[in-house]
Amino acid sequence: MKTRYAKRRKKLKIMVFIVLVSIGILFALFVKKNKSEHEGINMAQACKVIAYACGYQPSDGHGNYWYDEYIDYVREKQIFTDFKAKDAFTRKYAKELFSYCGVNFTEELYSYDTFSNEQFSQLIYELKDFFSSGDNLSWVEAAVVATPDMDSQLSGWSVCTDKGIYSFKGLKLSGKVDKNCVFLTCGSEILMFV
C-alpha cells in the first residue's frame, strides 16, 4: 500500500513540476512578445533628434555614452523635467515638448502611451517649424548597402546607403541592410530610422 502511494506522490510531483515549467515558459514568451511590441523610441534617441532640431552642434568625446551630450543639452534647455536616457518617450514627454515649442498638445492625436519611431518622427515633422533648426531636418528614403562590419573602409559610425555615406550614433543597423528605409537626417547624420 505504502509503495503505491509513494509512486502516486512521485508521479504527482513530476506532473506539477512539468505544469509549472510549462507555465514559466509561456509567461516568458508572453513577456518577450509584449516587450517587443511596445519597444519604441527612448529618451536618449529623442534627445538627439531634438538637440539637432534646436541647432546643437555635437562635439567629439563628450561623456561616457554616445547620448550624454544630447541629454545634457536638452536638460540645459529645460525641455523635459525629469528623465533617464533609457526611459521610453511617452505622452508626458510629448506634452512637455509641445509646451517648450509653445504649441497646444492635442490629446486625441497622441493617445498612445509610448511612441514608436514612426510616431515620434511624425511628431517632430509637425513641430519642425517651431525649432530653430527644424528646416535642417530631412526625411530620406534610402537602402543600407554596407555597414562597418561589412566594409573595412567605413569608419565605426558610418553607413553606406544608395544615397551616399552617412554617419550615425546609437542606432542598430541589424536587419537594415538591403532594405529600403526612411531615415530622419540632419546633414550627413542619420538621427533615426522611421
Range-by-range predicted roles:
Residues K172-F183, G187:
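Short nucleic-acid-contacting surface segments enriched for D/E, G, S/T with interspersed K/R
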Residues E189-V194:
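OB-fold/S1-family single-stranded nucleic acid-binding modules
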Residues K2-K172:
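N-terminal propeptides
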Residues K163, G187-S188:
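Residue-level signal for tight coil/turn positions that link beta-strands
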